[in-house]
Amino acid sequence: MLSIPLVCSSDFAPAAQVLAQEFNLPIRVGEVPETIGDCEFVLVLDETGLALQQTGRKAPGAVRAEFTEGAVDHRRKFGGGKGQMIAKAVGVKAGFSPRVLDATAGLGRDAFVLATLGCRLQMIERSPLVFALLRDGLARAHAFAHAQDRELLQVVERMELAAQDSKTYLQGLAPEQFPDVIYLDPMFPERQKSADVKKEMRAFHSIVGTDEDADVLLPLALEHVRFRVVVKRPRKAPFLNNQIPSYQLEGKSSRYDIYTRKKLPD
């Protein structure tokens, strides 16, 4: 992980020490991001969980993996179910909820949507920073759901996470372990600043970086999947690996390129 300081109050120092040792992070106890001037980003551990926060008084909001409130939870409750474009892209239908490998998990938002639709998710994330944020979000969601939301608990229990490079993970799969669907949403440089991308997410992208080897991942995914590979792309972006998909589903700002290996089960 990049050497980003981990900031916490004294109450959270013991938990922060464990996290800092795991990811080799410096700890700053008692400091607050607003007054830190010698680094651009910090990780903050407090009662709301783990978050990435830009420093300074005019910094945008914190970035965290969140599944119990906000837009992600609203989509779980009111998002349109199997009629959503992502559901159609991966092949969710009555009687079939595919096993999905999310090879570029990020903050887990698309994986969570698929899990709400009944899919079992294996999420792979190679960035230690993003892995730490996502693991924390899943742990908080599990604790919350176990206490007060059994339906959410079923969703979260369909999501598994591994810290690994997806290429290495795929190469280690035996044929009987191949997922039904592999989902790719690689991170690319923004061609322009979009009003649709919040300032805090632009900051997140700037520190996490881009998936420059994404073109290599597509052919590898096609060799290690049962039914299809789904690639999420900005609507006007070129095809991944310059490879023409079997078909596409287009939305207002993004699209899904679907590469089929064989027909989904009826």
Swiss-Prot record:
Entry's EC annotation: 2.1.1.242
Subcellular location: Cytoplasm
Amino acids binding S-adenosyl-L-methionine: R109, D110, E125, R126, D185
Protein name: Ribosomal RNA small subunit methyltransferase J
Keyword Transmembrane helix found: no
Family per similarity comment: Belongs to the methyltransferase superfamily. RsmJ family.
Function: Specifically methylates the guanosine in position 1516 of 16S rRNA.
InterPro entries named among the record's database cross-references: 16SrRNA_methylTrfase_J, SAM-dependent_MTases_sf
One GO cellular component, as annotated: cytoplasm
Upper classification of the organism: Bacteria, Pseudomonadati, Pseudomonadota, Gammaproteobacteria, Cellvibrionales
Domain of life: Bacteria
Reactions listed under catalytic activity: guanosine(1516) in 16S rRNA + S-adenosyl-L-methionine = N(2)-methylguanosine(1516) in 16S rRNA + S-adenosyl-L-homocysteine + H(+)
Sorted UniProt keywords: Cytoplasm, Methyltransferase, rRNA processing, S-adenosyl-L-methionine, Transferase
Enzyme superclass (EC): transferase
Molecular function GO terms recorded: rRNA (guanine-N2-)-methyltransferase activity
